[in-house]
Amino acid sequence: MNIENYLNETLKEHKLHFTLIDPDEQTPQEAVEIAKQAKKARSDAILVGGSITDQEDLNITVKSIKEEVDLPVILFPGNISGVSKYADALLFMSLLNSTNPYWITGAQALSAPSIKKMGIETIPMGYLIIEPGGTVGWVGDSKPIPRKKSDLAVAYALAAEFLGMRVIYLEAGSGADSHIPVDFIMKVKKLTNLMVIVGGGIKTAQDALEVKEAGADIIITGTVVEETDDTYKKIKELTDVIH
């Protein structure tokens, strides 16, 4: 199955929710249990990755999920170690507002030959860090876009589109106090033809609804799933408003 086609076809029916699993935060067994509950709660895919990833843990986690859960598993690599041959697809991303060329094209060039050999489907994506940015903003040497400067986000998103990317990910950072401002999402969606992913700071159904109504195509939640006592209930609260 071509994952990008699956996403585009599903978007004709409803907006999407991805459950983010960070192998650094869960054991493979815990990751499988989260993925099972995500499937039951109608999440549309499992996103696997983090800012710091051990490749052995990643391989075990992805393989375990694939063996037990019938959902697409998409990689969200934080570095060249964030690649696994067991995944269905990979968000091949460039951190657009990094000050370090390594995160813009360096890591991508280093990992590309291995990805080619593995035969993993790649989805070209621009990754944009918005304040506060969290761990990924620090690790990625980014200049997080101020929350009142939506025009800067639009400029980067247009650049991503003109460079041939088909997806833009607006990231507030894992565990952010609040989600991406709605005007960022609205303007990027209106002024580009990109698939818009939004993550960071989405903790409640109301948050998810605001982001969806602003124009997000795919909504990512991770921290809120890690911290809840009832994974199924929390994800279902989100998917009920997203779908």
From Swiss-Prot:
Sn-glycerol 1-phosphate binds at residues 169-175, 200-201, 222-223. Disulfide bonds: none annotated. Pathway: Membrane lipid metabolism; glycerophospholipid metabolism. Mg(2+) binds at residues 22, 51. One of its GO terms (biological process) is glycerophospholipid biosynthetic process. It catalyses: sn-glycerol 1-phosphate + (2E,6E,10E)-geranylgeranyl diphosphate = sn-3-O-(geranylgeranyl)glycerol 1-phosphate + diphosphate. GO terms for molecular function: imidazoleglycerol-phosphate synthase activity; magnesium ion binding; phosphoglycerol geranylgeranyltransferase activity. Keywords: Cytoplasm, Lipid biosynthesis, Lipid metabolism, Magnesium, Metal-binding, Phospholipid biosynthesis, Phospholipid metabolism, Transferase. Its cofactor is Mg(2+). Its EC number is 2.5.1.41. InterPro entries: GGGP/HepGP_synthase_sf, GGGP_HepGP_synthase, GGGP_synth, IGPS_HisA/HisF. It is found in: Cytoplasm. GO terms for cellular component: cytoplasm. It comes from the Archaea. Prenyltransferase that catalyzes the transfer of the geranylgeranyl moiety of geranylgeranyl diphosphate (GGPP) to the C3 hydroxyl of sn-glycerol-1-phosphate (G1P). This reaction is the first ether-bond-formation step in the biosynthesis of archaeal membrane lipids. Belongs to the GGGP/HepGP synthase family. Group II subfamily. This is Geranylgeranylglyceryl phosphate synthase. It comes from Methanosphaera stadtmanae (strain ATCC 43021 / DSM 3091 / JCM 11832 / MCB-3).
